[in-house]
Each structure stands twice: as structure tokens, then as C-alpha cells.
Amino acid sequence: MPVDSTSELLKHYEVYETIGSGGFAKVKLGRHKLTGEKVAIKIMEKKDLGDDLPRVKIEIEAMKNLSHQHVCRLYHVIETTSKIYMVLEYCPGGELFDYIIAKDRLSEEETRVFFRQIISALAYVHSQGYAHRDLKPENLLIDEDHNLKLIDFGLCAKPKGGLGFELLTCCGSPAYAAPELIQGKAYIGSEADVWSMGVLLYALLCGFLPFDDDNCMVLYRKITRGKYSNPHWLSPSSILLLNQMMQVDPKRRLTVKHLLDHPWVMRGYSTPVEWHSKYPLGHIDEDCITEMAVTFKQSKQRTIQLVSEWKYDQITATYLLLLAKKRQGRPVRLRAECPVIDIVCSPLQDMQLKKSLRFTEDDDGVHPVVLGSMVFPPDCYDDENPWTPLTPKNTHTTNTPRMKLYPETTEKWNEMAYSPVIEHSRPCRQKPERRERTKENKENLAVPGTDGDVFALPAPRTPTSSRKVKSNRTVMTTPNHNNNKSSEVNKGAGSATKEGSRRREVEQQQNGQQGELNILAFSPERRSRSLDLAGCQVDSGQKRKGGKVFGSLERGLDKVITMLTPSKKRGPRDGPRKIKAQYNVTLTNQTNADQVLNQILSILPEKNVDFVQKGYTLKCHTQSDFGKVTMQFELEVCLLQKPEVVGIRRQRLKGDAWVYKHLVEDILSSSSQWSA
């Protein structure tokens, strides 16, 4: 049953900075109050989800039914009249994709460690009747123990007739999609997943994709032919395994069952891959039950009864997070429940709260303290430190630089300085009709009810006037743009040149000549939504409104968090952040952060990259010939603790992951100051 207020979330969680963003959702770093455990909070606006609301239901139902050591855990689901919150396991190591970039490519031995975990996760997911359909490095996160966790089940399918039932929907990420899928043929989900695993294995071993091209029709042709190069460093056994997994004929491909004890997978190991869950659903731990019973002042029998309902509410979240603490060898202890601040004290305040709860990003005015690979306020607690009850009178909002946890390849970036109009990096994608999309989503027929009744629909919005707050950020653009600020930050399709028109005509002619290949182009709505997380993706007029909706809601949420987060004195940021070395940080041989920043500022215009500067952070984006944003990413100059040198933190926000990789490498290699 939906609740009316966001206070249900803030009653149980402390909410910190945005760590992921997309067209449909924001992901914020949070901390569960009773256990002190860090979590990722995925926040979705129902009105922005539109026809994708049933997909959220599919993802939630899948994650409720999956409990595995290499699958991201769902803890809590909160639904309000306008929003859906998913509280998920937090993985501080970031994406496997960033790890590949940091290493350039992985050794066969390290690849084997990761790949065994991927096989384990997929074998389990398939055993539960699900096909993932969106396997890629961006959808695998690294936890604090350097183990992989599979995320983003928004495109998964659980056919009513079983996993052997043929699917029809063309979805996922084109570079990882199987030939039968992009040709529009009926396909078996598990067979398509094996192809994607082969592409993923190739990316781990080589540092680039086996099938890649700027033109998606050329890309599809390469995939349907199944021809790719084998770099000289690949061993014969690796080449053989890749060939067995990336067979154009799905019936000739290896199965996940064969991968469990494949000779390449077994090298250096005495046992096949263990795919069974170490954490079976329904397990009740006596120590966790005892601690909860004492804290909640309930009998153990009653506590077991409440936990066994698995409602994915506060009871479920508390139990699962306590269990996670125990598995990590930490004390099974809960904090004494602090008094809950009644945020909504009157109808007027209730109205003001609902009006103000929108998502946006305010300027950071504080110096964050870095713990590992995450940013926290200075007085955040650890398990060893005592807990201090929070009072509303001396707390301040803490806004810190965001790091992306669940990136999206084709989603909006809700930044005030940028145009909300997005163009995907592949030039030949076409915008499908909404009615066609509805017809094609038939894999998950087991979900009860109609699409429109999956969640309670939001109430119609009463038209109100609003004033736009002008940003005071400095917008830096490349020399080939006009000096007018409006043209710098919001270029529409009207700026297209004659050359662009000719290019469109050529592309249309090319597309018309590809009919004999019978290739089905990926629609933006059915591409990966990796929020996500990352994700993680929109290209419709309806969803362009999401920028404004998310914008003010997050700002309002920050205002509410002001009353509930630890206090922090505000002060101007007069220097770069000090952080520990991370996978997404490039080391330099410099000690002067300002010098490195100036070098980057001089390089970006040469690469036709526009940017907005906020202190030592550059929010960058590239545009197509028609003025639409195709890539968004962050570069932040920071100081490393060990070694004491300047580093550049890089983070993809939107756009094709491999295009981003090449662009950032080009930017950093353009200066002679980066260390090897």
C-alpha cells in the first residue's frame, strides 16, 4: 500500500550524496539507521517511468526471488503515491568496467577469477527461471571483498513456459547482443546470455570489444557474421573458449552447464564452479532474531514470524543487514532506535514538503571526508564509534561530489546547465511507436495484473506556476560555439547545418539498402536501463520532463535531510579532495593540482568537449552535429593520500561505455604529464 510521504524513507535511512543517475532514477548513498550499514537507495519517479513502470515490478520481483553471493541484494522497497524507493546492497569497488580501464586489460589468471564468479551468478539466475539479457561490465559491481555482484534486472525475463520458452523482445546493449536477437528472430534467453558472456570475457582479456563500430548497421553486420580478431596475447585455450561461446548458431554454443567445468575455467582449480547459493532464501539466523527481538521488544517467536513474511520492509531490511554484518565477522548489534522526527506537522507543512521534494543537485559547499572509495560527512560513525542521536536544530545539509554507482548508457543526465534532449551514440537508432513497445513486452506474462496496475499510479498533478532558479555556475564551451549562454548550454535540432542534412540523407539511403540483412534496430526504450542501477534510458518527449521533476525533488529531499543528517560546518572549497587510490583514478607524476587542472582545461576545447567547472570537478559533455548531447562524464582533479601525487578521477555519466573509454584515454594521453 503506498504511503503518502517520503518520511517513511527518512525514518529508517540517512541519505547522502547522489552516486548514480539516469533518466528514470537517481541512486543515492545511504546508511541504515538501526544497523549502521551503507546502502544504495534507488529513487524512481512514477510519472517519469511511464510505460516502464511494469519493468520496475519485474526487477523488484526478480530481486526478491534471488539470493546469491554474486547477485546484488535487495533489502527494502518503499512505495509512495509518486515514487518508488529500492534499497540495495552497496558495492564500494564500483563497476567492473572501470576496473578494466584501470588495468587496460586483465591477465588470464585474474580474468578466470572474475569469470568463474560471473558463471556462478548466471547459472544460479538461470536455475531460478530468469534470463538476464543485459550482461556487460557496467552491470557487474565490485564489493569490498573484491567479489563481483550482478545488478540491473530491469530487462530480465522469466518466461511463463520456463527458460526454454522462446522470447521475442529485442533488448539489451547492441555490442553484447546475440546475432539471433538483433535479427529479430525468436531466441532462448539463456543462449543469448552465453553469447553476452563471451563478449564480456573477450573484453576482460583484451580491453576492447570483439564487435564494435560507430555505425550500428555495420556493428550488426559484424555480429551476424561472428567474425572478430584474436590479439596475439590470447592463449590457444582462451581463443577456443571464446569461439565456443560466440557461435552464430545458438545451438552450437556452449551452455552454462558446460562452462561450470570447462578446461579453461578449471585451470588452477580443483573443483567446478560452485553456483548454488550460499545464502538460500528463507534462512533464519538465531543471533539476528535474538538481537531484533530485544531491540523491538518482541518475543523471538513473533520476530521469526515477522521476518518470515519477507515483505521487504523495515523488518526485512534490518534482518538482512544484520545478517550481512554477521557474515563479515562483525558484532550482531542494533542501535537503540532514536526518536523519529515528525516531519509533517501540519497540512501546510505537508503541502510544502510534497511541493519541494524533487531531485536536483546543489553546489557542494563542504569539504567531505573520504572513507575508502566513498565520500561521507566527517562525523559519520563506524561500528566501533558510539551512535549519537540526531537533533534537528544543529544539523546542516551535506552535499558532496557524486560518484556513479549504477551508470546508464543512454539515459538523461538531469543537470540544470545542460539540454535535456538526448541523442544516442549510434546514428541509426529509430524512435519506435509507444504502442509497438507495449506489444513486444510479452516475456514476463507471469506477473499478475495488468501493466497499469503494477503499482498505484500517481495522482494527477494540479497545474502550478513555478519559477526557475538560474544557476550561477560558469559554463565553459569550446571555441566553435557562440558566446551566448543560452546557445552554449541548450542547442536544439534547429542548429543543424546543410552538411548535417546531407548526412541524414546518406544514412537513410544506407538504412534502406540493409533490408536483405533482416536486422532489427535497437530502440532507445528497449536498450539497457542499468541503474544501474545504472543505469541505467530515454528519448521521448514525455520523459524529457523528468529533468524538471527530478530537479526540484532532490533539492527538496536535501532540505529534509538537513534535519536528519550529522552536522557539518559549511565552508568554501579552496583545494582538491584528498582520496585513496581507486580503480577510476588515473595517477599523474605531478604534485600541483592547479597545474594539472589547467592542463586539462586547455586540452578539452581541442577535443571538442564542453564542460561546466565546479571547483576541481569538470562536468563534461560532447554533442552531435545536431547539438544533442551524446556523452557526459566527470573529471575531477584530486590529491591521493598514497602516493602523494595528483590524480584524475573519471566517471562516466551517460553514453556508450567504450566510446567514453577511448575519449578519456585520448584526453589524458594528450598531455605528457600523466605517469605510466
From Swiss-Prot:
The protein's UniProt keywords, in alphabetical order, are: Apoptosis, ATP-binding, Cell cycle, Cell membrane, Kinase, Lipid-binding, Membrane, Nucleotide-binding, Phosphoprotein, Serine/threonine-protein kinase, Transferase
* Modulation of this protein's activity: Activated by autophosphorylation of the T-loop at Thr-169 and Ser-173: in contrast to other members of the SNF1 subfamily, phosphorylation at Thr-169 is not mediated by STK11/LKB1 but via autophosphorylation instead.
Which species is the source of this protein? Answer: Danio rerio (Zebrafish)
Record's compositionally biased regions (Polar residues): 462-489
Basic and acidic residues bias (residue ranges) = 423-443
> Which positions are catalytic residues?
D134 (proton acceptor)
Q: Which positions in this protein are listed as binding ATP?
A: I19, G20, S21, G22, G23, F24, A25, K26, V27, K42
Q: Per its UniProt record, what InterPro entries does this chain match?
A: KA1/Ssp2_C, KA1_dom, Kinase-like_dom_sf, MELK, MELK_UBA, Prot_kinase_dom, Protein_kinase_ATP_BS, Ser/Thr_kinase_AS
UniProt lists compositionally biased (Low complexity) regions at 508-518
Q: Where in the cell is it found?
A: Cell membrane
Q: How does it sit in the membrane?
A: Peripheral membrane protein
The terms under GO molecular function for this entry are: ATP binding; calcium ion binding; lipid binding; non-membrane spanning protein tyrosine kinase activity; protein serine kinase activity; protein serine/threonine kinase activity
- The record's region (Disordered) falls at 423-518
Q: Where is the Protein kinase domain?
A: 13-265
| Region of interest (Autoinhibitory region), ranges | 328-673
Enzyme Commission (EC) number? 2.7.11.1
Q: Which reaction does it catalyse?
A: L-seryl-[protein] + ATP = O-phospho-L-seryl-[protein] + ADP + H(+); L-threonyl-[protein] + ATP = O-phospho-L-threonyl-[protein] + ADP + H(+)
Q: Which cysteines are joined by disulfide bonds?
A: none
Its family? Belongs to the protein kinase superfamily. CAMK Ser/Thr protein kinase family. SNF1 subfamily.
Residues modified as Phosphoserine: S173
What Gene Ontology cellular-component terms does the record carry?
Answer: cell cortex; plasma membrane
Protein name per Swiss-Prot or TrEMBL: Maternal embryonic leucine zipper kinase
